[in-house]
Amino acid sequence: MKKQKFTLLLICISIISNFCWSQNFTQQLRGTIVDRQTKNLLADASVVIKDAKLIAISDSNGKFSFSKIPIAKYDLVISKLGYQNTLINGIELNSGKEVVLEIELEEAVTILKEVTVSSNKNKEQFHNPFALVSTRQFGPQEAVRYAGGFQDPARMALAFAGVSNAGSDDNNEIVIRGNSPRGLLWRLEGIEIPNPNHFTDGQGSTSGIVSMINAYSLAKSDFMTSAFPANFGNGLSGVFDLNFRRGNNQKTEFTGQLSLIGLDFGMEGPIGKSGSSYRVAGRYSTLQLLLNSNIINLNTNNYNPNFRDLNFTVDLPTKKSGIFSLWGLMGNDETYQTTLTEKNIDKGSLNVFGFNHKISFRKVFFKNVLSISYQSQENLKQNMSGGLNGLVTRQLIYKYPSLRFSSALTYKFNNRLTIESGIVLSDLSYNLKDNRLSSKNVLFNYLNDDGSTNFVQLYAQLLAKLSSKIKTTIGLHQYKFLLNDATALEPRWALHMESKWGGIFSTGVGVHSRLEPVSVYLFKRYATNGSFTQPNKNINPGSAFHYVASYEQKINDKTKVKLEAYIQNLTSVPIDTAYNGTYSILNTSGGIPLNVLENAGLGKNKGLELTIEKFYSKNFYYLITASLFDAKYQNKNKIWHNTIYNNSYAGNALIGKEFKLKKNNSISINIRYLLRGGNCYTPINLKESIARSTTILDYTKLNTEQYPDYWRTDLSFSYKKNKNKSTWSYGADIQNVTDRKNIIYTNYDNTNKRINNNYALPRIPIIFMRCEF
């Protein structure tokens, strides 16, 4: 009898399963259409789903909707009389989550009687309308799809031309066109934020081991590598201009993910019936599972990391007063490491909360952002050997509470001319303590300051469409740093020209600079009598003059080839005051220099980049990039040297394919190959190191040596299964799938009297399971 019941149960399960497999699951696709400059809602725009031959017309509120669309990937064509047509490829519908879009249309200079779609706008039309050159728009799809990306925006950017990793694979640090990673600006929701990464690497660092911002939380965002528009200040090498995704304002949805990095959860939905919404996403670290497993061959030296983070948005639209938004990003991390000789405890945290208001009138768009942030870093080191057991060798506490306000006004005179002006006010508070052990085993105080200072930025810029094929921007950015009264006026200009045969020529110039952390300015140097000075308090930010030109040729609507050349001249770079000093801030990614600095250094970067790209369509895409570049710096002795980031060349090949299985299911495979020249370094003088029992570098060969080529292959694959009201994904993202041993630095081993090689991470497989419902 039990056997018969069991057989009957199996038959029922089989019938239900076959029924589920045979269903054609559907989903809703909807969104809002707005003017690109003024954000005014656009009525009577048509949205066509190409393959399905369906059409929707936006209503008086700019909204459109398709109901019960079979789940698949679709291309959309959006058009409106008097506006340029836009084609968006690869919109993916799954049964577990609705797709809600905000589509921006750019007003045409001339109204044509008949308009045809001639370009793919989903990557070329940047989120910022004033960005005309060296900018790439991206969304969560890229960060999730690209192999080795780990759902991290910075790791994803390694696929772009001119971008390479700085060294070890355990950090998402990126080098943009040979510049130091510390020159990168992070912006979120239209305002600057501190470094949004876990396990950061010292003061001024812009990176970490794990990003606090999961790619699934992002809306369309921009990544810039040169000649940024005038509304971007305090960035020298590049800009991540990120935007959070808004929650679904009609339906409550949930997301869960379990991986070897962390446990993720998400929830979003409507607030009442007024069109308001919320979205919240959090993550709790399970990184220790990866380190303790036998999946990777890694000596962790009792390294115990933990992290957690959370981000949210609340969107509150009104009928006449615009849209009010609340948003936040919170994260903290700690590591505990104990060896036979030392105990090391590191703690870091970041909390950012923002309030946005934006409102559109007929020709005006007005946006205000108010944010408050709190960033802290703590480190405690203790000696654990001999008679000095328990002796504190270093104790630091860096705390940065900050208040920022940004206000921008955009005025669109007509379909040819738009201006924008704005102000950014930053109140930068600090509480800094840095105690280090002296040669006499006494803690010496190198930093003990608390207070606040201000950073003021003003800008104005103009966008002029000279014809339907030519547009240009011109702008000015000015800043003043009240801690030492540093000030500068930075001009910006760009030009964009399209040809009738599908070619695009773009060029731009700009002056850019970036402040150092307050701790760099206030660091103390002691004299033998115990008195101290703060010699670096009055150093100015170094300036970079960017010159860039590119030519892009469309092969078809899905494929393009782009060639871009650039020159960057850096002046007033902080360097060591000593004539034969070797320190330049261009060679550092983080940390406080112990040297006395002055603005007497120079730098120069030049390069050529090639991009060949097929946008995602028909379940297939590829991205191939190659870069040749040269990065040099000059110290007080006027001799040009390689920067440590002068890899000479870098390349990337990324390809992906999705295979449809039975109805509603698919398998995706993505492969990425990364190649670059090795970092430059100063060799160790082994003979002198042995004689002195410590590391001695041969500075007569400053940065003349180069490590072997760095290369690795990343692989990701996933299986996606759509059910009636949920979508399940199972897969793995494997970094360095071939287990390549890349040398990242060498050190002198005094015990064995030899030079040792230190390698980047081995094969790292991140297995995950994700559910959306």
Residue map of PLM features:
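Periplasm-facing N-terminal accessory domains of Gram-negative outer-membrane beta-barrel systems
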Residues: 22-120
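Transmembrane beta-barrel wall of Gram-negative outer-membrane proteins
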Residues: 28, 259-284, 298-334, 345-372, ...
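Periplasmic N-terminal accessory/gating domains of Gram-negative outer-membrane beta-barrel systems
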Residues: 92, 100, 121-228, 239, ...
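Surface-exposed extracellular loop regions of Gram-negative outer-membrane beta-barrel proteins
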Residues: 192, 197, 376-378, 434-436, ...
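Outer membrane beta-barrel strand-and-loop segments of large Gram-negative receptors
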Residues: 402-404, 446-459, 540, 560-621, ...
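Structural signature of Gram-negative outer-membrane beta-barrels, strongest in the C-terminal barrel
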Residues: 412-420, 424, 447-571, 625, ...
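Gram-negative outer-membrane beta-barrel transporters
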Residues: 465, 469, 567-569, 588-679
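C-terminal beta-signal and adjacent terminal beta-strands/loops
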Residues: 622, 674-694, 710-714, 718-773
